[in-house]
């Protein structure tokens, strides 16, 4: 039994707990109720705040408040719910006021600007600046002293600057002089380098070189030359060195620099004649001439050895090859520029000395000198001299360029081929000239390239000009795009402005639908106000027909639920009169303005009755009566304006009709008069004789006579037909055809003259008949 009782107690406890759980509210539903209460209260607060801002004139703040309230209620109840109608109505009303404020041209642009604060800031800024009137004499004297001290310091600084600038100019002059000296040093550097390289070895060979020189100048004795040659070879064999012709040439080069005055004159002549060549190139040409003379002095030694027969030909060839290689090595190490004209001068000088072999570089290549010492004939000395004189006289360089071409081609030949062909020492001079010829070739090519560069520069400028034009065209193409963007931005701004009206229309239309769905008086009156505001939106968007419809709908609803003396009716009549006036319906406008005045007068009468019945204060009634009295003159002015515009409109219509009638009559009367005259003229000849018909026919022909302009192309064709056989060598048929054309033209002219005379006679006969009738 105890167990059963405990089980029953447990079951009862479970049932009680279950009932308690069912009675307890769910936490989610309670939270929803709290949220709903918060949303409604918040929406009411926002609506009150928005109406306050709307009354105070803070339209943007009112729009924000109504927008937030509408969004809260729309999220909770849905956009078409009855609870959202009021929020949507006030939101649309505030948007309408905002659109009016944005579109209003005569609005207060300085609204919200604190002018007094700006004036106070200006006074504060002015107070910071010292006034001259408030400054004492002592302060003025102190200021003067400070100014004078500052001026003196500036003058002292200027003087120091001038003194500093003078030594700087002196330093610049010295630096320029040093630069000039450095350039001279640069010019003389190759010669000094040659002397330094020659000094250690040339002292050992002074005796042999002097003997070789003495043998070359008087008569080139074969025995002395041979002995000098053997001494040179003995020295070379003792020291274990091969003879280097470059060392001998460098030694004799230094001696010729000390003795040769003619060479100096030859160095100066190219400087005088060729102004376009730089100074350094001229001096280097002089150095090459010296080397050529040294070779000319050394050549007889080698040739005399060949004549004497004391040495075999193989040794002579080896010595020649060694000399050629040494000269090539020395010349390749030096930066010497030579011209073929200078080489020709050197060849001419060598030919003047007796007993020496002439080495001339002709146009077609180097000429191998003859081994005989007696009779020696130059290959082309006159051509080289002519080239020299032409260049000295300042003639054109084109001939020299033409002569340089084969010499430059010879530079491509290797040295070994010239030695194998037995060119000997003469090839060394050609090799030296041809080795330096590529540099001249570069110079000549540069001179030839100058016009090409000029043309390229011109083409580049043209291309740049075309690029600039393309850029300008691109800019011109871009500018329309920019203008399109600007137009789009303006359109967007306009859309934003129109967007406020559109949004206001949408909100008010939604509020109208919500209120019309309800059958209460308050909802219907809100629907009437929605129609009124929709009409105002239509007026702002200049859709006056729609505005009239909306105002009439509003008026119909108000007449159902409002008394005849209500001020809302007066407002609706007034707005409807404005819409009619904007739509040029002045009669209806005057009628609506009159109805508005009637409503106001009824309201004033009702207020006076209420004042009599009331026992308390009459301030409220008196205040409203004064407001209504102030409205009456404005409405009456609107009536007068409508009547005047109606009169002016009628006058304008009459004037427009008159102008239209005049234009129509002026367009048709001349043609009618002409038709009547033509009919009269046509009837009279029919009543008369048949000859009048002939007269009319002749006049018809006279009007269509040919003009001289039609004859000119035919005459031109006839002239062309006459000229073609003469120029192209055609047959006489074309000439005959041209004559036939001219004869036809003359015959036509005669026929025209006869027809004109016949017409004149017929016309005179017609006039006589008409006078007789």
UniProtKB/Swiss-Prot annotation:
Biased composition (Polar residues): 198-207, 369-386
Modified residues (N6-acetyllysine): 33, 241, 251, 284
Effect of inactivating the gene: Mice develop to blastocyst stage, probably as a result of maternally-derived Nasp, and then die.
GO BP: blastocyst development; DNA replication; DNA replication-dependent chromatin assembly; G1/S transition of mitotic cell cycle; protein transport
InterPro entries on file: NASP-like, Tetratricopeptide_SHNi-TPR_dom, TPR-like_helical_dom_sf, TPR_rpt
Example of a GO MF term: histone binding
Residue positions where N-acetylalanine is found in the record: 2
Origin superkingdom: Eukaryota
Coiled-coil positions: 597-645
Short motif (Nuclear localization signal): ranges: 702-708
Subcellular location: Cytoplasm; Nucleus
TPR repeat windows: 43-76, 528-561, 570-603
Residues bearing PTM Phosphoserine: 127, 175, 188, 242, 304, 319, 384, 395-396, 466, 483, 489, 648, 691-692, 712, 731, 737, 742
SUPFAM superfamilies given in the database record: TPR-like
One CC-aspect GO term: cytoplasm
Protein family according to the UniProt entry: Belongs to the NASP family.
Physiological role: Component of the histone chaperone network. Binds and stabilizes histone H3-H4 not bound to chromatin to maintain a soluble reservoir and modulate degradation by chaperone-mediated autophagy. Required for DNA replication, normal cell cycle progression and cell proliferation. Forms a cytoplasmic complex with HSP90 and linker H1 histones and stimulates HSP90 ATPase activity. NASP and H1 histone are subsequently released from the complex and translocate to the nucleus where the histone is released for binding to DNA.
Protein name: Nuclear autoantigenic sperm protein
Gene name of the encoded protein: Nasp
């Amino acid at each position: 039994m105890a167990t059963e009782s405990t089980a029953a107690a447990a079951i009862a406890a479970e049932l009680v707990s279950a009932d308690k759980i069912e009675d307890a509210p769910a936490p989610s539903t309670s939270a929803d109720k709290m949220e709903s209460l918060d949303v409604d209260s918040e929406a009411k607060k926002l609506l009150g705040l928005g109406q306050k801002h709307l009354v105070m004139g803070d339209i943007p703040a009112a729009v924000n408040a109504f927008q937030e309230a509408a969004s809260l209620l729309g999220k909770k109840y849905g956009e078409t719910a009855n609870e959202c109608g009021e929020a949507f109505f006030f939101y649309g009303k505030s948007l309408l006021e905002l659109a009016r404020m944005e579109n209003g041209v005569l609005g207060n642009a300085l609204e919200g600007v604190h002018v007094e604060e700006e004036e106070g800031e200006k006074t504060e800024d002015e107070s910071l600046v010292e006034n001259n009137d408030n400054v004492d004499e002592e302060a003025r004297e102190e200021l003067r002293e400070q100014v004078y001290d500052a001026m003196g310091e500036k003058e002292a600084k200027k003087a120091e600057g001038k003194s500093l600038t003078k030594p700087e100019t002196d330093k610049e002059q010295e630096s320029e002089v040093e630069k000039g000296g450095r350039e001279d040093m640069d010019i003389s550097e190759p010669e000094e380098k040659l002397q330094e390289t020659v000094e250690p070895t040339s002292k050992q060979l002074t005796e042999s070189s002097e003997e070789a020189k003495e043998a070359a100048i008087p008569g080139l004795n074969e025995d002395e030359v041979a002995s000098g040659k053997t001494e040179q070879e003995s020295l070379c064999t003792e020291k274990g060195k091969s003879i280097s012709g470059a060392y001998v040439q460098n030694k004799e080069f230094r001696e010729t620099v000390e003795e040769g005055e003619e060479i100096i004159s030859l160095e100066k002549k190219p400087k005088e004649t060729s102004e376009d060549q730089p100074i350094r190139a001229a001096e280097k040409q002089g150095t090459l001439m010296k080397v050529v003379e040294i070779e000319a002095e050394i050549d007889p030694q080698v040739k005399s050895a060949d004549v004497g027969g004391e040495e075999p030909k193989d040794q002579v060839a080896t010595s020649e090859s060694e000399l050629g290689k040494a000269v090539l090595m020395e010349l390749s190490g030096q930066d010497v520029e030579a011209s073929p004209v200078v080489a020709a001068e050197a060849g001419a000088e060598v030919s003047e000395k007796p007993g020496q072999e002439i080495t001339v570089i002709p146009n077609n290549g180097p000429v191998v000198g003859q081994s005989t010492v007696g009779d020696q004939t130059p290959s082309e000395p006159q051509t080289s001299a002519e080239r020299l004189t032409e260049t000295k006289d300042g003639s054109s360089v084109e001939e020299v360029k033409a002569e340089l071409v084969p010499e430059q081609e010879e530079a491509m030949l290797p040295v070994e081929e010239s030695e194998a062909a037995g060119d000997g020492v003469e090839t060394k001079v050609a090799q030296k000239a041809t080795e330096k010829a590529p540099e001249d070739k570069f110079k000549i090519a540069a001179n030839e390239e100058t016009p090409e560069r000029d043309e390229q520069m011109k083409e580049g400028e043209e291309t740049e000009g075309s690029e600039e034009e393309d850029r300008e065209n691109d800019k011109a193409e871009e500018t329309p795009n920019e203008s399109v963007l600007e137009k789009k931005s303006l359109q967007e701004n306009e859309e934003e402005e129109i967007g406020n009206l559109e949004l206001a229309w949408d909100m008010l239309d939604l509020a109208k639908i919500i209120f019309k769905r309800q059958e209460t008086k308050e909802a219907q009156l809100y629907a009437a106000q929605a129609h009124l505001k929709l009409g105002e939106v239509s007026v702002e968007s200049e859709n006056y027909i729609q505005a009239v419809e909306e105002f009439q709908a509003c008026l119909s609803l108000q007449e159902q639920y409002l008394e005849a003396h209500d001020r809302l009716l007066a407002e609706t009549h007034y707005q409807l009169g404005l819409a009619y006036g904007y739509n040029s319906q002045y009669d209806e406008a005057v009628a609506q303005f009159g109805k508005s005045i009637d409503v106001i007068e009824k309201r004033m009468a009702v207020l006076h009755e209420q004042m009599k019945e009331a026992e308390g204060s009459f301030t409220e009634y008196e205040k409203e009566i004064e407001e209504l009295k102030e409205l009456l003159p404005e409405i009456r002015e609107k009536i007068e304006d409508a009547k005047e515009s109606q009169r002016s409109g009628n006058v304008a219509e009459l004037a427009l009709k008159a102008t239209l009638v005049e234009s129509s009559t002026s367009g048709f009367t001349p043609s009618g008069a002409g038709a009547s005259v033509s009919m009269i003229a046509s009837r009279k000849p029919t009543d008369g004789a048949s000859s009048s018909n002939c007269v009319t026919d002749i006049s018809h022909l006279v009007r269509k006579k040919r003009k001289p302009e039609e004859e000119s192309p035919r005459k031109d064709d006839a002239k062309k037909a006459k000229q073609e056989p003469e120029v192209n060598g055609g047959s006489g048929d074309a000439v005959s055809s041209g004559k036939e054309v001219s004869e036809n033209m003359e015959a036509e002219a005669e026929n025209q003259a006869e027809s004109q005379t016949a017409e004149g006679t017929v016309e005179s006969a017609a006039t006589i008949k008409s006078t007789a009738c």
